[in-house]
Design a protein with these regions (language model features):
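Non-transmembrane, aqueous-exposed alpha-helical and coiled segments at domain scale
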Residues: 24, 34, 157-160
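Glycine/serine-rich anion-binding loops at beta->alpha junctions
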Residues: 9-16, 100, 119-139, 238-242
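Single conserved hydrophobic/aromatic residue that forms the stacking wall/gate
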Residues: 245-248, 252-254
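Carboxylate- and glycine-rich phosphate/diphosphate-binding segment that chelates Mg2+/Mn2+
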Residues: 99, 183-243
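Extreme N-terminal starter segment of soluble prokaryotic enzymes
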Residues: 1-3
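Glycine/threonine-rich beta-strand-loop-alpha-helix active-site module
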Residues: 105, 109-112, 119-125, 130-181
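Anion-binding (especially nucleotide phosphate/pyrophosphate-binding) glycine-rich loop
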Residues: 72-131
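Glycine-rich nucleotide/cofactor/substrate-binding loop typically near the N-terminus or early
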Residues: 26-95, 183-191
Length: 254
């Protein structure tokens, strides 16, 4: 008999992989010679790297980076033998500072390390990360420069609140391999980039923010998006992120 086991995580209790193992042991104890296949699930927040490497071989790399509060941390990314690079943001991009003082700079550091290692196909799990700076810090770590109206450098690693001072964006020194890489972003939350359905506007109470404070952050994200479109002459349509469960082995398909 063939048995497929694909258990979701029990949030905060056991992982998808652990749940699968328990079910596998139970089935094996009751059905002799059962052909049992485990399929771990991940949801854009937890277990992405573990799930992928359960199905594929490859290497994991430790790199020095920063958390959302710009504290030194050790982060990790993985590269499979099939050429997929996995970055699980919530494993290192956490913070305790006020939301508008957190940065995604550390994500850029890990992404840079992966690009230095010839990464071509990069999957980034964004669920559970601690920053809401529209990726400004990440871009700075990758070489982007931001200037105010007096041509002074704006250091967005200090947090999202610095976005309001940006008047010009210079991407001339961004990592040269970024343009050649295929990026896939995963999230555990259905949201818009900004507006009433943005993640911060839907979850601000969990961060002990009031609606007005959340709206300030949301407006910064909107401003950064508009600045990009204006400065770089880009036409960007509405950006939405949807929640989905994926099987680990499917992410390795071309």
């Amino acid at each position: 008999m063939k048995v497929l086991v694909a258990m979701d995580e029990f949030n905060g209790i056991i992982s998808s992989y652990q749940a699968n193992r328990y079910v596998e042991e139970a089935v094996a104890s009751q059905i002799e010679h059962a052909d049992i296949v485990q399929v771990p699930l991940f949801n854009g927040r937890h277990e992405l790297m573990d799930s992928v490497f359960l199905w594929q071989s490859g290497n994991k790399y430790r790199v020095k980076a920063h958390d959302a509060d710009m504290n030194d941390v050790e982060a990790m990314y993985g590269q499979t033998d099939s050429g997929m690079t996995v970055i699980e943001g919530n494993l290192f991009l956490n913070g305790e500072k006020p939301i508008d003082q957190r940065s995604s700079y550390g994500l850029g550091e890990v992404l840079k390390a992966a690009l230095d290692n010839q990464a071509k196909h990069i999957v980034i799990s964004l669920g559970g990360i601690g920053s809401f700076d529209a990726g400004a810090g990440m871009l700075q770590a990758l070489g982007a420069k931001f200037y105010d109206d007096e041509a002074n450098i704006v250091d967005v690693s200090e947090g999202a609140y610095k976005i309001k001072y940006i008047r010009r964006i210079d991407l001339s020194d961004v990592h040269p391999q970024l343009a050649n890489a295929k990026l896939q972003l995963m999230s555990d939350f259905s949201s818009r980039l900004y507006g009433k359905q943005s993640e911060i506007m839907q979850t601000y109470q969990t961060f002990q923010l009031n609606q007005s404070e959340a709206a300030e952050i949301d407006n910064l994200v909107w401003y950064f998006s508009e600045l990009f479109k204006s400065e770089l002459k880009l036409a960007i349509g509405p950006i939405a992120v949807s929640y989905t469960h994926l099987r680990a082995h499917e992410t390795g398909r071309n």
